[in-house]
C-alpha cells in the first residue's frame, strides 16, 4: 500500500501513541505540524479507504462524539510489505511459500495459518 508523506506522518503519530486516537488527538500530538482540522479529516478518511486504519470507537469531544482510530498493522509490517510489494510484486507469495516449506511449519502451525486465511476470506 502506497502512502503519501502526510499519510505516513499520520500513521507515525498513531503507531507511536499505541492507543486509539481521535481527530483532535492527532492535532494535539502533532505540535510540529500545522495541520488543519479538515486536513486531518481528509487524511483519516483516505487511510480508512486504504485499509490502514480502522474505527476503534467513539469518544466525547466537547458537545459531540468523535471517532477514534487504530492502525490495522504495525509499522514494521507496513514497511516490510511496502518494500516487497514495491520491488517484487509476487514477493508475498514467494515469502509465504518459503515459510511454509520450512521444516518448522508443522501441521498445527499450518492449521493455524489455514484458520487465519479462512477468516480473511470471509
Regions found by a protein language model. Give the residues of each.
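Amphipathic alpha-helical dimerization/coiled-coil segments
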Residues: 76-122
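Basic amphipathic alpha-helical segments that dock to polyanions
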Residues: 10, 41-50
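Short acidic, hydrophobic short linear motifs in intrinsically disordered regions
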Residues: 20-30
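Short, cationic-aromatic polyanion-contact patches
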Residues: 4, 58-80
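Short alpha-helical segments that sit at the start of domains
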Residues: 1-13, 17, 74-75, 85-89, ...
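A short, conserved structural fragment
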Residues: 48-60
